[in-house]
Regions:
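Thiamine diphosphate
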Residues: 1-161
């Protein structure tokens, strides 16, 4: 069973998140469909989305960046040299392509190492589950708010639909 996209977005908004940007992924379609009508800002690259989110935070917004896990690799330098160093929080919503599922070959490596990459750079994360998504969102919102650090919600195929 899946979390409805509207419920997931509603949970993010309940925690005050109000600026959404990123690069699309089919695993995130239900979320993106919901956000399109609410001012979602598409970015050409994930590191660009991180920059947009940092600017939004400095302007008083609470940003979320949506991306595929391959985009985590693209955005690591921005996260490490901007967000982590200067404690500029961002909530990352990352699809888990190639993670414990059969997927296209280009997703195999990132699927295997996504959680280790996050652990290596000390970005807390939760893998979103249907029965745990409320707690998952709350836990990562707390990291964002209290520690002023990036935090990630990882979305498996079909977890949000």
């Amino acid at each position: 069973m899946s979390v409805p996209g509207a419920a997931f977005v509603g949970e993010l908004k309940r925690h005050g998140f109000d600026f959404f940007t990123g690069v699309p992924c089919s695993f995130l379609t239900a979320i993106l469909d919901r956000l399109q009508a609410e001012g979602y800002r598409a970015a050409v690259r994930e590191d660009v989305a991180i920059g947009l989110a940092a600017g939004a935070y400095l302007a008083g917004r609470r940003p979320v960046v949506l991306m595929q896990n391959s985009g985590l690799g693209v955005s690591l330098n921005a996260l490490a040299s901007l967000n982590l160093i200067y404690r500029i929080p961002v909530l990352l919503v990352i699809s888990l392509r190639g993670y414990q599922i059969v997927d296209a070959p280009e997703h195999w490596v990132m699927g295997e190492i996504t959680t280790r990459l996050l652990e290596t750079v000390k970005i807390p994360y939760r893998i979103v589950g249907e029965s745990t998504y409320v707690d998952d969102c709350a836990a990562m919102a707390a990291v964002y708010q209290e520690e002023r650090l990036p935090a990630a919600l990882l979305i498996r195929k079909g977890a949000v639909a």
